[in-house]
Regions:
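Pocket-flanking alpha-helical
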Residues: 73-80, 116, 217-220
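Extracytoplasmic/periplasmic solute-binding protein
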Residues: 1-23, 64
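Short helix-initiation/N-cap motifs at beta->coil->alpha
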Residues: 48-61, 72
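Glycine-centered hinge/linker elements that transmit conformational signals in sensory
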Residues: 19-49
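Paired acidic/hydrophobic, glycine-rich loop segments that form the ligand-binding mouth/hinge
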Residues: 65-70, 86-88
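Extracytoplasmic/periplasmic substrate-recognition and gating elements
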Residues: 79-142
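C-terminal capping/gating helix-and-loop segments adjacent to ligand/active sites or protein-protein/ligand interfaces
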Residues: 49, 145-146, 164-218
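Short amphipathic alpha-helical coupling segments at ligand-binding clamshell hinges
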Residues: 30-37, 118-130, 138, 187-190, ...
Length: 225
């Protein structure tokens, strides 16, 4: 859902995503039109809500042609589609009559060391190994976890891996860094409920402006304290 708001110039926690007091700006036409685009998508007979594994099941029986997910579902999707597997960055959608680029939230993991641990040198050495080239290669080989090591990204088989290309293109072209401010913790549950209201048909083209404004006030009341 956030991908639609981000696509239509809505702003999460200021321009750099670090201003908790700024809250989430989905006000006015930009938010309403994003909501209307989601309502239109849900009303399309080709749309399937991926609840309870329906999307994966649909890929398996052929009733679903394309699946919107992430690299965490690679193993299951690859098993089903085999040589027909493909992956790309986020698509564009019509919002307010204009093609807009969907944008995902992007993030990363880090390996940290407790500064108060007893054996600092050993802990640092372990952290360097776990975040290093060899460990990233093992993660890729065993679990298809995409490496960030530039040397690994430049050689086969990583270089030509469709999944790697899709994720990196998404990160570089169709994503924004997910804010790490505390307000994000108060966003997810209301956002999930808003999404469910769209899927359930409670939010329509006729009441999109009203419902988006209610959602806007709700999330910012809890976030901006």
């Amino acid at each position: 859902m956030s991908s639609f708001f981000l696509a239509n110039d809505c702003v999460y926690f200021g321009k750099d995503g670090k201003d908790n007091a700024a809250g989430i700006d989905i006000s006015g036409d930009k938010g309403t039109n994003a909501t209307k685009a989601m309502v239109s998508m849900v009303s399309n007979p080709n749309f399937v809500n991926d609840a309870g594994g329906v999307g994966i099941a649909g890929l398996r029986d052929g009733s679903v042609a394309a699946y919107f997910s992430g690299s965490w579902d690679y193993k299951n999707v690859k098993e089903i589609l085999g040589d027909n597997f493909g992956a790309v960055q986020l698509p564009k959608v019509k919002i307010g009559g204009t093609d807009k680029q969907l944008k995902a939230f992007a993030g990363s993991k880090a390996v940290a060391v407790n500064p108060n641990c007893k054996y600092q040198q050993i802990a640092v050495a372990l952290a360097k190994y776990l975040g290093g080239k060899e460990a990233q290669q093992s993660h890729y080989d065993l679990r298809s976890v995409i490496p960030c090591n530039t040397e690994l990204l430049a050689v086969e088989p990583v270089k030509s891996d469709v999944l790697v290309t899709a994720q990196n293109n998404t990160f570089n072209n169709t994503a924004v860094i997910q804010p790490t401010v505390t307000g994000m913790n108060d966003y997810w549950t209301p956002a999930q409920n808003f999404s469910k209201s769209i899927v359930n048909g409670e939010i329509t083209l006729d009441n999109a402006a009203e419902k988006t404004e209610e959602f806007y006030k709700l999330i910012n009341t809890s976030i901006v304290k």
